[in-house]
Every structure is written in structure tokens, then in C-alpha cells.
A protein has these predicted regions:
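Conserved, helical-rich catalytic subdomain that frames metal- and/or nucleotide-binding sites
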Residues: 28-77, 141
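Short, well-structured alpha-helical segments that form the helix of a local strand-helix-strand
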Residues: 107-120
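Conserved beta-strand-loop-short alpha-helix elements that form
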Residues: 10-14, 55-64, 70-100, 119-121, ...
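Single conserved hydrophobic/aromatic residue that forms the stacking wall/gate
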Residues: 1-8, 13-15
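Short acidic-glycine loop/turn motifs at beta-strand connectors
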Residues: 18-22, 134-135
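P/S/T/G-enriched low-complexity
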Residues: 135-142
Length: 142
């Protein structure tokens, strides 16, 4: 069992994905564009490149009280958690993220391959990647 939380768009880690048989985004940003998607104003594929994608609707310190979203996830053997900045998620489509992580490399090589894919796709923003394999037999750190 894993609990994650979110306020805003997480300056350090923007997106959290669960990867196993497919890719699933675990959290939703508190952003104007995410709200537009939720209300049907734009399609999810339009959100990634929308000019207002960085306008957040919730942030720590913006008000005395802030609402935090908590998410519960049941994990199983083979799951891999990907946390990343938008320097990765804006440059590499979900399908490519999935294929890189499930491509038979070890977790460190997968992380390096994700960064390279973002650079090859024209990434100029900072690219942060954390991959966690909760049921791994050994720990690898880069």
C-alpha cells in the first residue's frame, strides 16, 4: 500500500506514474489546465502543450489553509513508480515512458534512458527522474 499527496503541481516532482502492464498517472495537478480537462473544455492531449499549463490553482503558502489531496495505491510485484519533473513529462509521451521503463533494462539504465529521450526530443528544461521498484530484490542508486 502506498499513500501519496499533492498540492499544486509539485515544484520538484511533477508527475507520478505507476508502471506495470501499462502506465497510469497517480496524481492530478492543481492547475488551470487540469481543471479545463476535468470540465471537458480541452482534451488531455492538448493540456501538455497549453500556454496556461503552468498556472496553478492551489499552492502551499498562498493561503493560511490549503487543501491537500491524498491518494491510496495498492502496489504489487512488478510495479515501478516514476516521479518526474515536467522536463521529462512534457517531452516524452506516456507510451514512450512505458516502453523505456519496461524495455528490459535495469532501473538505473531506464532512468538514464528516460533523460536521454527527453533531451533527444528537444528538452531544454531541467529533467528530474526518480524510479522506485518497491518489491526489488536489490537497491540501485544513480
Amino acid at each position: 500500500e502506498m499513500t501519496s499527496s499533492l498540492v499544486g503541481s509539485e515544484m520538484c516532482i511533477r508527475d507520478r506514474y505507476l508502471i506495470n502492464q501499462g502506465i497510469q498517472q497517480l496524481t492530478k495537478d492543481h492547475s488551470l489546465v487540469e481543471e479545463m480537462v476535468r470540465l471537458g473544455g480541452i482534451k488531455p492531449e492538448e493540456a501538455k502543450h497549453h500556454p496556461d499549463k503552468n498556472i496553478i490553482t492551489r499552492a502551499i503558502g498562498a493561503k493560511a489553509d490549503v487543501e491537500v489531496d491524498f491518494y491510496e495505491h495498492r502496489l504489487k510485484r512488478g510495479d515501478i513508480i516514476l516521479m518526474c519533473t515536467d522536463g521529462l513529462s512534457n517531452m516524452v509521451e506516456d507510451e514512450e515512458l512505458f516502453h523505456i521503463v519496461q524495455g528490459g533494462r535495469d532501473i538505473v539504465e531506464s532512468g538514464q534512458a528516460l533523460i536521454e529521450a527527453a533531451k533527444e526530443n528537444g528538452g531544454t528544461d531541467n529533467i528530474g527522474v526518480v524510479l522506485i521498484e518497491p518489491f526489488a530484490d536489490e537497491v540501485s542508486v544513480l
